Amino acid sequence: QSIKKKIKLPNRIDIKGILLEELFQEQFFARSGILLEGISIFDDKPFAHKIGFEGWAMFVYSLRNKTHAQKVKFNYLLRGRSVIGLIKKFEGKHLSPGIILIPIKNSIIFEDIFKSHKIDYSKKNILLER
């Protein structure tokens, strides 16, 4: 309760206290959201950084059902040609053909790109050591 009183924010927020051991219990539903996307209210840094990790989204995608021209166009979009590619723009990493890592903070935007281009993909949120 003392933390709630010290925080001055324009909007009301709901703060719940939990024990550290609760955070790592499987039945605590908010744990993945906190570990992957949580931001500390004390220093405005990602919670994952405090425990030595970074939150990423790993996209595995396939261009198998696309024409050659569509594949080339999409690869230019990702990697860039005459303009900066989306992987670099969104601070991502190209791991191998069909696999990209994107920081969790940019993952929704990147997911929308796959959807808008009708690309078959799967997404896994992961923590990687810093």
What are the functions of these language-model segments?
Residues 2-130:
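Catalytic core of pol beta-like nucleotidyltransferases
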